[in-house]
């Protein structure tokens, strides 16, 4: 791929600092710190570029409200590449206001109502449309220049994802990176012992679909008495539903509508029903791939993989995306969206946009990507020197490929942003969960009051219809 920085030609003088930013990011994770490091040969730092900063106004400080700080927590801690670029190349600063994850939205509302300064806020699914309708966030369309949207090669692969978040003709969410995909972990050794095909090879040959997935689980569990083996455990209801490529709530740019009756959604729900009815699913919580040889697949985000490897060092684990619907032409991936929101009434829109652009550069710069890979592949060892957590290079490269938007469509259903009646875990019961949680959980879990798609559909339909009506007013 042609380097994003090599193709920025004939840019205006106002974008000169952008070019310098690329130089700084390429060394942000390859130069050693000048002091305070335990290992000066590997500890990264940044290089200050002597280019005139872009004028963001005075002061150039933006206020960040979140449950985590973007700034280093100690003098010895390296700055993230995006923050280093924002500070060194643009003269920016990030002022942190701490709050808890459960209180962030409440704190934001309190600050807005009090007229207190807050500029930037973490993205989560409640931002659009709920947060926008509560006048908590502002669109970023007026600061596209500061975002670098016109720089060839910088945002090209994210433009489809960005457009999927467009609301009322405006862009409130500008994802700069995808991460943490839902995926399936399996053991190649176990597959060979059971004379089953390698799912990764099936995926590479475009044969990894629901039908093959079910056939493998049924064959695996049929060899011993029922309930002794399981086809799958972990968290996969949402990934299965979204592998259809269909949304529960549709948006045409003006109005929302229910898509609950879509045949693909019905097929996904019937598949969950079938998995539960055939006792293929083990609902008992697991934090990693089971090491007893009694489960074929483990579904989770990528956070579990390092522990799974450590607990199964001889099982040759590998990961694949969730299988696509049998009649689908493309894989749809459920993953995290990395974005920062511009808070309503902020006077620092250009500063927030410039920070987001720095995040995008950090997500694209090859030196940064190489350093991130090196960190991910560094095993964490116990005091005895045995691996406690590790990821192989093959696994890492595969995960990154599953986030490639030319091969996968990132799922985005506005239903998850339409309030607690639609998206909430409640008290983890059928009566307190949101409609989306019941759609992705109820037919899989034991002792739920519904055991068929028809009953579940009739229960969630009026909830979905009522919330859509409220948002369309």
For each feature predicted by the language model, list its residue ranges:
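Short helix-initiation/N-cap motifs at beta->coil->alpha
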Residues: 98-107, 206-212, 282-291
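Glycine-centered hinge/linker elements that transmit conformational signals in sensory
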Residues: 216-217, 251-284
């Amino acid at each position: 791929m042609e380097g994003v920085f090599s193709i920025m030609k004939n840019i205006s003088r106002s974008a000169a600092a952008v070019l310098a930013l690329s130089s700084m990011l390429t060394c942000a994770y390859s130069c050693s710190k000048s002091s305070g490091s335990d290992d000066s040969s590997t500890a990264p730092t940044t290089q200050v570029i002597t280019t005139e900063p872009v004028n963001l106004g005075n002061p150039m400080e933006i206020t960040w409200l979140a449950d985590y700080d973007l700034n280093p927590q100690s003098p010895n801690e390296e700055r993230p590449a995006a923050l280093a670029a924002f500070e060194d190349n643009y003269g920016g600063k990030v002022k942190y206001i701490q709050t808890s994850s459960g209180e962030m939205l409440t704190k934001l509302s309190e600050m807005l109502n009090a007229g207190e300064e807050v500029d930037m806020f973490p993205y989560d699914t409640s931002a659009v449309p709920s947060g926008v309708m509560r006048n908590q966030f502002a669109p970023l369309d007026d600061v596209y220049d500061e975002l670098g949207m016109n720089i060839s090669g910088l945002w090209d692969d994210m433009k489809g994802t960005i457009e999927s978040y467009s609301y009322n003709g405006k862009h409130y969410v500008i994802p700069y990176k995808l991460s943490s995909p839902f995926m399936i972990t399996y053991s190649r050794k176990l597959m060979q012992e059971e004379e089953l095909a390698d799912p990764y090879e099936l995926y590479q040959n475009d044969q990894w679909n629901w039908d093959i997935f079910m056939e493998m689980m049924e064959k695996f569990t049929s060899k011993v008495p029922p309930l002794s083996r399981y086809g799958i455990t972990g968290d996969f209801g949402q990934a299965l539903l979204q592998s259809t490529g269909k949304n529960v709530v549709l948006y045409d740019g003006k109005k929302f509508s229910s898509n609950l009756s879509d045949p693909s959604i019905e097929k996904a729900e019937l598949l969950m029903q079938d998995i539960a009815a055939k006792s293929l699913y083990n609902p008992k919580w697991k934090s990693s791939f089971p090491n007893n040889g009694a489960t074929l697949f483990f579904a989770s985000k990528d956070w579990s993989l390092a522990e799974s490897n450590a607990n199964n060092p001889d099982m040759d684990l590998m990961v694949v995306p969730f299988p696509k619907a049998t009649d689908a032409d493309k894989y749809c991936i459920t993953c995290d969206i990395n974005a920062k929101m511009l808070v309503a009434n902020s006077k620092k829109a250009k500063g927030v946009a410039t920070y987001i652009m720095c995040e995008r550069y950090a997500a694209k710069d090859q030196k940064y990507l190489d350093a991130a890979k090196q960190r991910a592949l560094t095993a964490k060892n116990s005091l005895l020197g045995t691996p406690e957590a590790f990821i192989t290079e093959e696994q890492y490269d595969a995960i990154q490929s599953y986030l490639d938007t030319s091969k996968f469509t990132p799922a985005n259903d506005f239903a998850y942003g339409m309030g607690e009646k639609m998206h909430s875990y409640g008290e983890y019961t059928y009566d307190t969960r949101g409609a989306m949680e019941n759609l992705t959980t109820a037919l899989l879990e034991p002792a739920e009051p519904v055991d068929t798609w028809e009953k579940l559909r009739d229960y969630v339909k009026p909830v979905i219809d009522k919330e859509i009506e409220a948002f369309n007013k």
